[in-house]
Structure formats: structure tokens, C-alpha cells
């Protein structure tokens, strides 16, 4: 009976310390994306770019511009690293990643969203 009483006393603590839920963000034109497989970096400098999250295995970028998240597909790690280290992240983003309309080099309308992130 002592073991059962000990377990019952500990049960609320075990439940309270359950697994942490991964952060999920709402990506414009796509929907919710779990960031559990991403490496994210907050951008501390004055920029419209405020967060950069990258899943290197899937070559998938989620970026926050002001308060809105956008996504980019089939983007290589070198381009993301250059974005992270760029003196002006907004200028680098505009020139090398975004594009205009559907002609962006990593636009998810012309490059497939990784299967694990499809809705």
C-alpha cells in the first residue's frame, strides 16, 4: 500500500512535468507549422526581419517579418547562413530570397512544401 500511496502523491507532479509542446506558428498563405524540427534565431537588430527559423533536413525556411510568418521552400543552408549574417537582413532577404510574385527562387508556390509540413 505504501508504493501506491507514494505513486498517487507523485502523479500530479508527473503530469505537470509532462512533455513540452513544440511551438507552432501561423504561416501566411499556408497555415500552422510546428517549429520542433527548426533551428530558430531571434533578430535583435532594427529590421523588419525579426525571426529566422530553418529546418535544414527539409530545406525549409520560416521567417517572421514584423509580426507575420512567411515560408520559403528548397532553400539551401548557405543562403540561410548568409541571411543570418547579413549586415542588412531585410536587404538580403529582398534581393536573394523573396522575389516578386511567383518568381522568387524559393517561393513555395513554385517549389514544393516538404511533405511533413503539408496540410
Task: Pin down the residues of each PLM region.
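Sec/Tat signal peptide C-region and signal peptidase I cleavage site
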Residues: 18-22
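Positively charged n-region of N-terminal signal peptides that target proteins for export
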Residues: 1-4
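Acidic/histidine-enriched, beta-strand-rich ligand/metal-binding domains
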Residues: 24-119
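Bacterial N-terminal signal peptides
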Residues: 6-16
